[in-house]
């Protein structure tokens, strides 16, 4: 079973995303911010990460840059998920190592399409 880490400071978003990803047969972990996500990744590197942009403590892009610098960081597929519909944000996310980009609020089909496009489903 593939592992996915949901990183978002919104409990509601994590709950909705968990339901969708579990339907897709992912083993799901959650983190409220980038710092907590790094700790989860040190214990158990996921195959995929659904990552929010704006979070307290450590933003999504800060987390992603830190993860990609880790020698043992592996290369999980990262699907960026945010309310920001700005080319600068999208460019920064992709430049930091995101594989896919979806907008919040998202529909189930959007998440499924992003994970399918990334080769995870």
Predicted feature descriptions by range:
Residues 106-115:
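C-terminal output helix
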């Amino acid at each position: 079973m593939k592992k996915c880490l949901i990183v978002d400071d919104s409990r509601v978003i994590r709950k909705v995303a968990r339901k969708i990803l579990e339907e897709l047969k992912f083993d799901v972990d959650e983190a409220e911010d980038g710092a907590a996500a790094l700790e989860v990744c040190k214990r158990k590197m996921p195959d995929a990460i659904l990552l929010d942009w704006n979070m307290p403590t450590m933003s999504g892009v800060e987390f992603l840059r830190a993860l990609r610098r880790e020698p043992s960081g592996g290369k999980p597929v990262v699907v960026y998920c945010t309310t920001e519909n700005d080319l600068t944000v999208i460019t920064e996310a992709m430049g930091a190592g995101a594989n896919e980009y979806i907008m919040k609020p998202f529909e189930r089909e959007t998440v499924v399409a992003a994970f399918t496009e990334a080769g995870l489903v």
